[in-house]
Regions:
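Ribonuclease/tRNase effector modules and their secretory precursors
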Residues: 1-101
């Protein structure tokens, strides 16, 4: 799937088609991220900043949470038109900008 197709897929995504990997729940214990937050941002494509390729069939989605933080999601898009959230975390935008610069 091409990156442009990912955005179109997300725009048409139904909340019932979003599933969460057990790894996601394991990591939410350690991180200030929950299922409701992820579902909220997946429904707000206007906050989507960047899409990157990951492992085969996986993508990294960057959503702008605020001027200080971004929400990063690792997702799999299934042929059945379902989206599986594998992992999620928030990251400091200043820190990310320093890594780029």
């Amino acid at each position: 799937m091409e990156l442009k197709e990912v955005k179109v897929f997300l725009e048409r995504l139904d909340q019932d088609s979003i599933n969460f990997d057990p790894h996601f729940y394991k990591r939410t214990i350690e991180r200030p991220v929950n299922e409701g937050l992820v579902r909220n941002f997946l429904g707000r494509i206007d906050r989507l900043e960047k899409i990157e390729y990951g492992k085969i069939g996986r993508f990294k989605l960057w959503f702008k949470m605020s001027s200080k933080y971004s929400l990063v999601l690792i997702v799999e898009i299934k042929e059945t038109k379902e989206l599986k959230v594998v992992s999620a975390w928030n990251t400091n935008r200043k820190w990310q900008d320093k890594l780029k610069g």
